[in-house]
């Protein structure tokens, strides 16, 4: 082979090898692109809302004859569908309640800028829980806190923080309100915010941070709502609202709301005589509320809401150990499921109860005359048997020497069941504690447990003598 032939042969072999290497690199590139765009793709309906993807870095070391290729690609997790909550899981079986959260707002107010509040409550989105309260437009160590015992002023706003975070100066003011309710439908928050003159108030419906609808007072006598969470099932949220006398017959309606828009209004029906400040919970496929009768009964009204056909039924908790304050001594109190018991019915306090088969779990003040102490227990047959009084699993939440206040329920969806939780408002200041001029609160929160538990007392704990006047 002459020199020219050798050169041509070597050149041909080199060109062939180079071509093979080039084709291999193209194959590697095609494989990488295919993995990125096809291996991890997810099909989802076009009309479903999706959550932002979280990036994950995957490294692949591919060794070939000629090159070592270190390829880094960024992969998107398949989009997580955001769906309406349907609350179809069963209720958790519990033995009692365990401590969950306490915000210590009053104690912290002795040395920090903490809002003056009342009417607190708790509600959760699918990921975490939040505490709400109606602020008085002032911090505690501020002369504007004088005379904040009054319920309805134009300065009151709905405050919202992550559960356990006191209402500090950086707290978000969600809306203007002296009465409110909030709930999350699985996609966004709904806030119902009532404000204005007593004789012509307005309820604003704020969904996903935007005002969507409103309704004016229909009886011109302090339009008001739950002061605890509303409930949304398959995109329809229900809220109970009352307008009218606090000590005689009033006009109660249930509003059905979809993404902030009122789609239906149903009047109260059934045997309940007076309904205010309902504590509501999902009872699939409907919503159940236990409320306050401020006119005739110290037994609590029950309102059952059918989300599908907008029908309403009402009655009273059957337990003869009644839940309102003031009330008769347990030896003399009564309830027969259908009607108010006409026992110290005038006045009352927001509270809660929930059914557990034929039984009922409930919370109430320990004192039968004042908002002092707090206890929970289960009444066997208390949901279905008239005047049932067999009490078990009693727990003291706040001892009888300390003040309590409003209380209410909220629900938390777990992997296999829906847990019931409650909060207790711990009121401090006026009227009882006249050394100071303000009225405010902290909260303590418990949740249902299937485990064992101990004993204790969880009062507000602030020394009034150390507090700003």
Swiss-Prot record:
Q: Which metal ions or organic cofactors does this protein require, according to UniProt?
A: Ca(2+)
Q: Which residues lie on this side of the membrane: Virion surface?
A: 31-469
- The record places the following residue ranges in the Intravirion compartment, namely 1-9
Q: Which cysteines are joined by disulfide bonds?
A: 92-417, 124-129, 183-230, 232-237, 278-291, 280-289, 318-337, 421-447
Ordered alphabetically, the record's keywords are: Calcium, Disulfide bond, Glycoprotein, Glycosidase, Host cell membrane, Host membrane, Hydrolase, Membrane, Metal-binding, Signal-anchor, Transmembrane, Transmembrane helix, Virion
Q: Which residues bind substrate per the record?
A: 118, 152, 276-277, 292, 371
Q: Where is the segment annotated Hypervariable stalk region?
A: 36-88
GO cellular component terms listed in the entry, alphabetical order: host cell plasma membrane; membrane; virion membrane
Q: What is this protein called?
A: Neuraminidase
What taxonomic classification does the UniProt entry list for its organism?
A: Viruses, Riboviria, Orthornavirae, Negarnaviricota, Polyploviricotina
């Amino acid at each position: 082979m002459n020199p020219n032939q050798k050169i041509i042969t070597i050149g041909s072999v080199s060109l062939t090898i180079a071509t093979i290497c080039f084709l291999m690199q193209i194959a590697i590139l095609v494989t990488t692109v295919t993995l990125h765009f096809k291996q991890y793709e997810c099909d989802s309906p076009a009309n479903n809302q999706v959550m932002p993807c979280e990036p994950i870095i995957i490294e692949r070391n591919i060794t070939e004859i000629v090159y070592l290729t270190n390829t880094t690609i960024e992969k998107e997790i398949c989009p997580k569908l955001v769906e309406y909550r349907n609350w179809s899981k069963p209720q958790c079986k519990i033995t009692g309640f365990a401590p969950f959260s306490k915000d210590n707002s009053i104690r912290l107010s002795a040395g920090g800028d903490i809002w003056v509040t009342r009417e607190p409550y708790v509600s959760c989105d699918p990921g975490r829980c939040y505490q709400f309260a109606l602020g008085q437009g002032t911090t505690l160590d501020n002369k504007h806190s004088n005379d904040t015992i009054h319920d309805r002023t134009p300065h009151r706003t709905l405050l919202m923080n992550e559960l356990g975070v006191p209402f500090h100066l950086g707290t978000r003011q969600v809306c203007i309100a002296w009465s409110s309710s909030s709930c999350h439908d699985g996609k966004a928050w709904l806030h119902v915010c009532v404000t204005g003159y007593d004789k012509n108030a307005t309820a604003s419906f704020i969904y996903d941070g935007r005002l969507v609808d409103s309704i004016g007072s229909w009886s011109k006598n302090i339009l008001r709502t739950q002061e605890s969470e509303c409930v949304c099932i398959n995109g329809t949220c229900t809220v109970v609202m009352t307008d009218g006398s606090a000590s005689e017959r009033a006009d109660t309606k249930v509003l059905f709301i979809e993404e902030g828009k009122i789609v239906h209004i149903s009047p109260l029906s059934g045997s309940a005589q007076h309904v205010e400040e309902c504590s509501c919970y999902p009872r699939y496929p409907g919503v159940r509320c236990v409320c306050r009768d401020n006119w005739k009964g110290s037994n609590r009204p029950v309102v059952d809401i059918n989300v599908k056909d907008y029908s309403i039924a009402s009655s009273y908790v059957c337990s003869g150990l009644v839940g309102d304050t003031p009330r008769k001594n347990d030896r003399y109190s009564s309830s027969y499921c259908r009607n108010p018991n006409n026992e110290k019915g005038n006045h009352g306090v927001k509270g809660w109860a929930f059914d557990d088969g034929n039984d009922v779990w409930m919370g109430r003040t320990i004192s039968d005359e004042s908002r002092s102490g707090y206890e929970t227990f289960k009444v066997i047959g208390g949901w279905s048997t008239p005047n049932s009084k067999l009490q078990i699993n009693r727990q003291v939440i706040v001892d009888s020497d300390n003040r309590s206040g409003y209380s209410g329920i909220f629900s938390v969806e777990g992997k296999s069941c829906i847990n019931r939780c409650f909060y207790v408002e711990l009121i401090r200041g006026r009227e009882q504690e006249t050394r100071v001029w303000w009225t405010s609160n902290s909260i303590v929160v418990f949740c249902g447990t299937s485990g064992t538990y101990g004993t204790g007392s969880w009062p507000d704990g602030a020394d009034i003598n150390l507090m700003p006047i």
